[in-house]
C-alpha cells in the first residue's frame, strides 16, 4: 500500500472560522501523509470573512482517497459543512511537467535508431577502425579520424564541370578533438565587457570607471569701489570662498581687505534666473558700496578660469558700463529717476523671484544666481526704483516661457518712514552678459524683433515729475498703519503681474512719438517672507483679460464683477460646500481688473500697492479678504469678497419658500471702518444657522411624509401583517376594519406633516417680515486702510456733486453692497419692488410694456401713464368687428345645419343651450375617513350570495345550450329565379360585338356617336335597382346601373411598337384624329350593354384593357433590331472614350 501512494491535491471547502492547519493535518493524516496545507479566507469590503477554504497536498492511495471522500464529504465539522474534491492542478506544477515532457521528447528524437547502428557495428556513428576503412554492409561510408563514420560525397568542382569524389577520411589529419568539459558556460548576469585602453579619462569612462562627483564651489569676488564709480578697481580677484548663500541660510561673504563681514537677511535676497542652456559667465550688480561678481564654474575640474582671464573680462564689463555709472551716480541720492525722452529700451527680460523653492517656472538649481543686496535696516520691505538703460541677452527658450506683463509700471507701497527714507539708498542694474563666441549678434536682433512684437499691446503710461513726487510723498503720510490694524488685510491689492510667478518689469516702453517723459523701469521688489508671498501667489492665480482696461472702463468692469460675485456667493451657498477660497473666472477677472491702472479724472495718479502684513496672533484667526478698488471720474466703488477657510459657517444660502435675506446695496460702503464688519458678521451667521436648521427639518419631514403612507401601516399599534396563507381565513369585516385602521394611521401622519410644514413656513415668513432693526441682514464691508477712508472723505467734502451722484446710484438696484444708512428706504423699496405698476395693467398697459422693453433699462426712456394711448375708438372698432364676425358665423352655421337636415331627414338642432349645461368644476379628491358618517356613501356594500343547488345550476346550463328561436316573419321579398332579372336587362341593353383591339377597330370604336335625342326617345324599362335622394325631380333621368365607356388612348398609335412612332408629323396627325373623335358636350358616349357572367367569356369587355400589355408576334423583330442598335452604340461609345483618353494624355 505504501508503494502505490500518489501525491493528490484536495480542495476542502465550507470550513469554519477557527480552523487551523494542525486541525486539517490531524483530520486528513488518518488517510495519508499530509505534506502541505494552505488555508484561504475571502473577506468583504468591511473585513468580515465570507468564505474559508483550504488546499491539502497529501500522499494517498486511490482506495484511501475514496474512503476519505466518502467519510468526510458533506459532514459537519466545527461549524461548517465540509466539501472535499480533487483540486485543479496548479499552473506552476503543470508548467514544470510540460517542460520535463518537452525535454524528454527532444532527447528521444536526437538519439538514432539503436538497432540499425548495432547492425552496422557502430555505436552512435562511431567505429573502432583505422581511418579510411569502409563500413561493412554500407557502400560509400568510411571511418574517419577519432572513429567517426562519415559518408563519401560526390561534389561538383567550382572551376570545372567535373564531379569529384570527396573521401572525408583523406582530409581529416588536421582535425583536433576538443574535450567537452573544457568549455565552462558563464551565466548572462556575470558577463562583462572588457575594453582595452589607457588611463585617459575617455577610456576610463568607456570602461565604466567614473571618478567621484564633486560640485565645484562657487566663487565670490568682492571689488571695492572707489569714490568715482567709473574707475572701480578689482583687488584680490583670486579670493574664493565656499560659503555660498543656499536657499534660506544667511551667509557672511568675506570682504577683500579683511573688513567685517556684512550680514545679509535671507528674506531680502533677489534671485535672477537665467535661461537653462546659456549661462552667464559674469554677472555684475551695482550696489551703493561695492560690486559682487558671481562666477559659475563649470562641472569639470579642468575648466577653471585663470586670474588673467578674469581681469580681462572684468575690464570689458567696466568699459561697457561707463555710461551707465555716470547716470547712476548723478541720480543716486534722488528719490526717483526719470529717463530722457530720446531713450529707446531693448530690455529682454528681468525676472526676479522672491519665493525660494516654490518657483515652478525656474526651479533649476544650476541656473539660479543668488545676489545679496546691502541694506541699512533689516526691516526694509521695499526697495528702490531704478531707470538705468540696460541690455540683456536671453535664450529663446526662456523668452517664450515668460509672458509679457500687462502692468508695465509696478509701484510697491512703502510701509514706514524708514522705508521711504531708504528708498533711494539701493540701486540695481541689470546684469550684462559677455557675448558668446558666435551667433550672438543674430540672436540679439531676432529677439529684439520678437520682443517688440510681444510688447506692442502694453499700455504706455506717461508720468510727470509732479506725479512721481506726489507718489513718493503719499507713503510718508501714513506710516505703520498696516502693522497696527488687527483685522484681515488685503492680500493682493492690485498691480501684480499674475501670469508670471515673480514680479518683473516688462520692458520696451517705446512710444513712437516720444513726446512725453517715459520711465523705463520703476522697479519695486517685494522682499517679504517667502511663505507669505507663496500664499499670495496661490490666491492670486487669476486670469488675464485679452486686452488691458483703458481709461474710463473701470466702472463698467466694477459693475459686472460685483453682480457676478453676488451670483457666485449664492451658488456657493446652495451647494453647501466649505471651500477654502473662491477661485473662479469671474472673480479672478474682477481682481485682475483691480490690478489694472485706474485713472481718476484727468490726472495720471498711480495708486500705490501695499502688501498686507499677516497678523501673527495665534489665537486670532480671520478669513483673508481680497479688496478690489475701481476708480472712475465720477465715483469709486469698493467691494470685497471674503470666504472662511475651512469654516463651518459659510456665506448665507437661499432660504426655504422665498425666505431669502436681501442684500441692500450702497455705494458708500467705503466709509464704514473694519469694526462694523466685525459687528454684523456674528449676528447674521446666527440667523443663517437657524434658517438652515429649519430648512433641514422641513426636508426631513417632507421625506417622512412621503414615506409615511407605506411605513405607518406597519408601525400602527394593531400591527397587522397579512400573509397569503391565512388571507382566505379572515372574513370581510375583519379585513375592512384592518383597512380602516391603516387609513386612519396614514391620515394622522399626513395631517401631522402638514401641520409641521405650515409651522415652518409660518416661522420662516415671520422671521423675514418682522426682522428687528438691530440685526441687519446685509453685509457691510469696511475699507482696509484708514488712509483710504481719509482720502475718500476729503474727496467727498471737496466734491459735493459727486456725493449726490453716488446717492442716486445707490438707489438703483444694480449695485451689490449698500451701507447701513439706507436700511429704512430699502425696506420700503422691497415691498414695492415686485408690484405691478398701474400703467402696465390692461391691454393698453401691455402695449406700453412692449414699448418699454424695446428701450431696455435706459433711465432716459421710462414709460409712465402719460404714454398710455386713448383706446376708445380702436377698441370700439375691434368690438364691432368681432360682433359682426360672430353673427356671420352663426348664420352660416344655421344654413349648413338646415341643408344637412333636409338631406338626411334628421333633427340636427342643438337641444342643449349654453345656460342649461352645468360648467365642470374641479372638486378636491375626497380622502376617505372611516370615522365620518358622511363617508358611508363611498363604501361598497357587499351582498351575500346564496349557494345555488345542483338542480338550478343544471337548469341554467341547459337553457344556455338551447338554440335561439328565429321568427318566421318576412320583412322583404326574395326573387326565387335570377333569370327574370337577366332577361329584363337583356331586353333593355343592346348587344354589341366586340371588335379585336387593332388600330382600325380602336378608331371605329371611338368614332361611334349617338345623339342625345335618340337616347331620350328610347322607351325606358326598369332595370331592377334604382335609388334617388330626390324622388320627383330625378325620375325622368334614369340611366343604366353600369355604363361602359371606351378608354381614349392619346398619342400611341401602335401599342405593339411605340418606340418607332415618335416623329413630329405623325404626332400632329394623331392629335387631329383625337380632336375629331372627341364627342361634343351635348353628345353621349354609346353604351355597351351585354350579359355579364361571373366567369370571363371569349371577347369579354372586361379583358379588353389587358390587351395593351400583351406583345404580339412582331416583338422579336424589334428586339433583334434593338440589340443590334445597342451593340453599335456600345462600340461608338468605347471609341469616343478612347479618343478622349488620347487627348488627355497628349495635353
UniProtKB/Swiss-Prot annotation:
A Pfam family per the record: RRM_1
Annotated segments matching region Disordered: 379-401, 427-452, 472-511, 592-659, 686-741, 766-888, 932-963, 986-1017, 1055-1086
Start-end of Acidic residues biased regions: 441-450
GO biological process per UniProt: cellular response to leukemia inhibitory factor; rRNA processing
PROSITE patterns assigned: RRM
Cysteine pairs bridged by disulfides in the record: none
Domain RRM positions: 8-89
Biased composition (Polar residues): 383-400, 592-610, 629-650
Residue ranges that the Swiss-Prot or TrEMBL entry lists as coiled coil: 868-898, 937-963
Cross-link Glycyl lysine isopeptide (Lys-Gly) (interchain with G-Cter in SUMO2) mapped to chain: 225, 316, 1038
Classification via CDD domains: RRM_NOL8
UniProt keyword annotations, A-Z: Coiled coil, Isopeptide bond, Nucleus, Phosphoprotein, RNA-binding, rRNA processing, Ubl conjugation
Main localization, broad class: nucleus
Domain of life assignment: Eukaryota
GO MF: RNA binding
Subcellular location: Nucleus, Nucleolus
GO cellular component: nucleolus
Biased composition (Basic and acidic residues): 700-714, 732-741, 799-809, 857-883, 994-1011
Residue numbers bearing the Phosphoserine modification: 300, 306, 364-365, 416, 704, 783, 787, 819-820, 825, 827, 872, 1063-1065, 1080
PANTHER family: NUCLEOLAR PROTEIN 8
Record text on subunit structure and interactions: Interacts with the GTP form of RRAGA, RRAGC and RRAGD. Interacts with NIP7. Interacts with DDX18; the interaction is RNA-dependent. Interacts with DDX47; the interaction is RNA-dependent.
General function of this protein: Plays an essential role in the survival of diffuse-type gastric cancer cells. Acts as a nucleolar anchoring protein for DDX47. May be involved in regulation of gene expression at the post-transcriptional level or in ribosome biogenesis in cancer cells.
Protein name, UniProt field: Nucleolar protein 8
Organism of derivation: Mus musculus
Amino acid at each position: 500500500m505504501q508503494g502505490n501512494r500518489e501525491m493528490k491535491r484536495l480542495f476542502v471547502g465550507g470550513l469554519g472560522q477557527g480552523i487551523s492547519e494542525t486541525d486539517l493535518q490531524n483530520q486528513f493524516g488518518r488517510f495519508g501523509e499530509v505534506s502541505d496545507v494552505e488555508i484561504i479566507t475571502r473577506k468583504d469590503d468591511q473585513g468580515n470573512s465570507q468564505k474559508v477554504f483550504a488546499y491539502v497536498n497529501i500522499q494517498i492511495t486511490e482506495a484511501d482517497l475514496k474512503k476519505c471522500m466518502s467519510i468526510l464529504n458533506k459532514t459537519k465539522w466545527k461549524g461548517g459543512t465540509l466539501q472535499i474534491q480533487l483540486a485543479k492542478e496548479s499552473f506552476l506544477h503543470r508548467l514544470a511537467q510540460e517542460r520535463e515532457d518537452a525535454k524528454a521528447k527532444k532527447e528521444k528524437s536526437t538519439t538514432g535508431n539503436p538497432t540499425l547502428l548495432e547492425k552496422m557495428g557502430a555505436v552512435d556513428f562511431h567505429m573502432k577502425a583505422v581511418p579510411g576503412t569502409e563500413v561493412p554492409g554500407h557502400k560509400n561510408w568510411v571511418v574517419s579520424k577519432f572513429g567517426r563514420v562519415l559518408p563519401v560525397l560526390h561534389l561538383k568542382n567550382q572551376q570545372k564541370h567535373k564531379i569529384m569524389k570527396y573521401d572525408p577520411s583523406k582530409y581529416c589529419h588536421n582535425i583536433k578533438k576538443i574535450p567537452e568539459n573544457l568549455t565552462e558556460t558563464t551565466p548572462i548576469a556575470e558577463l562583462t565587457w572588457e575594453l582595452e585602453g589607457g588611463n585617459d579619462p575617455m577610456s576610463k569612462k568607456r570602461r565604466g570607471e567614473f571618478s567621484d562627483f564633486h560640485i565645484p564651489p562657487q566663487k565670490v569676488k568682492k571689488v571695492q569701489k572707489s569714490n568715482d564709480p567709473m574707475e572701480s578697481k578689482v583687488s584680490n580677484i583670486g579670493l574664493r570662498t565656499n560659503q555660498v548663500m543656499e536657499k534660506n541660510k544667511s551667509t557672511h561673504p568675506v570682504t577683500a581687505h579683511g573688513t567685517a563681514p556684512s550680514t545679509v537677511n535671507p528674506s531680502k535676497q533677489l534671485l535672477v534666473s537665467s535661461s537653462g542652456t546659456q549661462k552667464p559667465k559674469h554677472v555684475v550688480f551695482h550696489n551703493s558700496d561695492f560690486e559682487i561678481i558671481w562666477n559659475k564654474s563649470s562641472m569639470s575640474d579642468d575648466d577653471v578660469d585663470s586670474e588673467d582671464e578674469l581681469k580681462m573680462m572684468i575690464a570689458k564689463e567696466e568699459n561697457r558700463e561707463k555710461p551707465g555709472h555716470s547716470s547712476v551716480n548723478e541720480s543716486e541720492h534722488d528719490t526717483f529717476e526719470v529717463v530722457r525722452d530720446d531713450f529707446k529700451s531693448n530690455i529682454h527680460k528681468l525676472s526676479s523671484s522672491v519665493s525660494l523653492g516654490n518657483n515652478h517656472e525656474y526651479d533649476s538649481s544650476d541656473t539660479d544666481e543668488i545676489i545679496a543686496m546691502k541694506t541699512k535696516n533689516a526691516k526694509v520691505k521695499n526697495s528702490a526704483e531704478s531707470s538705468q538703460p540696460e541690455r540683456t541677452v536671453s535664450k529663446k527658450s526662456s523668452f517664450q516661457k515668460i509672458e509679457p506683463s500687462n502692468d508695465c509700471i509696478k509701484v510697491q507701497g512703502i510701509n514706514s518712514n524708514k522705508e521711504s527714507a531708504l528708498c533711494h539708498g539701493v540701486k540695481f542694474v541689470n546684469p550684462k552678459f559677455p557675448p558668446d563666441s558666435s551667433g550672438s549678434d543674430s540672436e540679439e536682433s531676432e529677439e529684439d524683433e520678437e520682443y517688440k512684437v510681444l510688447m506692442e499691446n502694453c499700455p504706455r503710461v506717461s508720468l510727470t515729475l509732479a506725479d512721481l513726487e506726489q507718489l513718493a510723498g503719499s507713503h510718508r503720510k501714513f506710516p505703520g498703519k498696516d502693522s497696527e490694524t488687527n483685522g484681515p488685510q488685503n492680500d493682493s491689492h492690485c498691480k501684480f503681474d499674475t501670469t508670471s510667478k515673480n514680479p518683473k518689469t516688462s520692458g520696451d516702453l517705446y512710444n513712437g512719438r516720444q513726446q512725453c517723459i517715459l520711465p523705463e523701469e520703476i522697479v519695486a521688489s517685494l522682499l517679504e517672507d517667502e511663505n507669505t508671498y507663496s500664499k499670495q501667489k496661490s490666491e492670486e492665480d487669476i486670469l488675464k483679460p485679452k486686452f488691458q482696461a483703458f481709461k474710463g472702463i473701470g466702472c463698467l468692469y466694477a459693475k459686472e464683477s460685483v453682480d457676478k460675485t453676488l451670483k457666485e456667493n449664492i451658488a456657493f451657498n446652495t451647494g453647501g460646500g466649505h471651500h477654502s477660497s473662491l477661485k473662479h473666472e469671474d472673480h479672478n477677472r474682477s481682481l485682475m481688473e483691480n490690478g489694472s491702472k485706474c485713472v481718476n479724472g484727468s490726472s495720471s495718479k498711480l495708486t500705490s500697492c501695499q502688501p498686507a502684513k499677516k497678523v501673527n496672533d495665534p489665537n486670532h484667526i480671520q478669513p483673508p479678504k481680497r479688496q478690489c478698488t475701481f476708480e472712475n471720474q465720477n465715483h469709486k466703488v469698493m467691494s470685497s469678497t471674503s470666504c472662511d477657510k475651512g469654516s463651518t459657517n459659510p456665506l448665507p444660502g437661499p432660504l426655504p419658500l422665498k425666505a431669502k435675506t436681501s442684500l441692500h446695496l450702497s455705494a458708500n460702503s467705503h466709509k464704514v471702518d473694519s469694526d462694523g464688519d466685525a459687528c454684523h458678521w456674528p449676528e447674521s451667521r446666527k440667523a443663517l444657522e437657524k434658517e438652515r436648521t429649519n430648512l433641514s427639518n422641513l426636508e426631513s419631514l417632507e421625506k417622512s411624509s412621503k414615506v409615511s403612507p407605506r411605513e405607518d401601516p406597519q408601525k400602527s399599534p394593531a400591527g397587522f401583517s397579512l400573509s397569503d396563507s391565512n388571507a382566505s381565513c379572515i372574513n370581510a369585516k375583519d379585513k375592512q376594519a384592518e383597512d380602516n385602521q391603516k387609513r386612519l394611521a396614514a391620515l394622522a401622519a399626513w395631517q401631522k406633516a402638514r401641520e409641521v410644514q405650515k409651522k415652518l413656513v409660518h416661522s420662516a415668513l415671520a422671521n423675514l417680515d418682522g426682522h428687528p432693526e438691530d440685526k441687519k441682514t446685509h453685509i457691510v464691508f469696511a475699507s482696509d486702510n484708514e488712509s483710504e477712508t481719509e482720502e475718500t472723505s476729503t474727496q467727498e467734502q471737496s466734491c459735493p456733486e459727486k456725493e449726490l451722484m453716488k446717492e442716486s446710484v445707490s438707489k438703483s438696484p444694480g449695485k451689490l453692497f449698500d451701507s447701513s444708512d439706507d436700511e429704512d428706504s430699502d425696506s420700503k423699496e422691497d415691498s414695492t419692488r415686485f408690484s405691478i405698476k398701474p400703467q402696465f395693467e390692461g391691454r393698453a398697459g401691455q402695449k406700453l410694456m412692449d414699448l418699454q422693453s424695446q428701450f431696455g433699462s435706459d433711465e432716459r426712456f421710462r414709460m409712465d401713464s402719460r404714454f398710455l394711448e386713448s383706446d376708445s375708438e380702436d377698441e370700439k372698432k375691434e368690438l364691432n368687428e368681432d360682433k359682426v364676425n360672430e353673427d356671420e358665423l352663426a348664420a352660416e352655421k344655421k344654413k349648413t345645419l338646415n341643408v344637412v337636415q333636409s338631406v338626411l331627414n334628421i333633427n340636427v338642432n342643438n337641444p342643449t343651450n349654453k345656460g342649461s349645461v352645468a360648467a365642470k368644476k374641479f372638486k378636491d379628491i375626497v380622502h376617505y375617513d372611516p370615522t365620518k358618517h358622511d363617508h358611508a356613501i363611498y363604501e361598497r356594500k357587499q351582498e351575500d350570495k346564496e349557494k345555488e343547488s345542483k338542480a338550478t345550476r343544471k337548469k341554467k346550463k341547459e337553457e344556455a345550450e338551447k338554440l335561439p328561436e328565429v321568427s318566421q316573419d318576412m320583412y322583404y321579398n326574395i326573387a326565387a329565379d335570377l333569370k327574370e332579372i337577366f332577361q329584363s336587362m337583356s331586353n333593355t341593353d343592346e348587344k354589341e360585338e366586340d371588335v379585336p383591339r387593332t388600330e382600325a377597330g380602336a378608331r371605329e370604336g371611338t368614332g361611334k356617336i349617338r345623339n342625345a335625342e335618340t337616347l331620350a326617345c328610347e322607351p325606358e324599362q326598369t332595370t331592377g335597382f334604382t335609388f334617388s335622394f330626390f324622388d320627383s325631380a330625378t325620375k325622368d333621368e334614369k340611366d343604366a346601373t353600369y355604363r361602359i365607356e371606351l378608354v381614349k388612348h392619346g398619342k400611341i398609335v401602335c401599342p405593339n411598337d411605340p418606340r418607332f412612332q415618335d416623329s413630329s408629323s405623325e404626332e400632329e396627325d394623331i392629335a387631329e384624329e383625337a380632336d375629331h373623335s372627341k364627342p361634343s358636350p351635348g353628345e353621349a358616349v354609346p353604351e355597351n350593354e351585354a350579359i355579364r357572367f361571373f366567369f370571363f367569356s371569349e371577347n369579354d369587355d372586361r379583358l379588353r384593357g389587358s390587351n395593351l400589355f400583351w406583345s404580339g408576334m412582331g416583338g422579336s423583330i424589334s428586339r433583334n433590331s434593338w440589340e443590334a442598335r445597342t451593340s453599335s452604340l456600345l462600340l461608338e461609345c468605347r471609341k469616343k472614350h478612347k479618343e478622349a483618353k488620347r487627348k488627355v494624355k497628349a495635353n
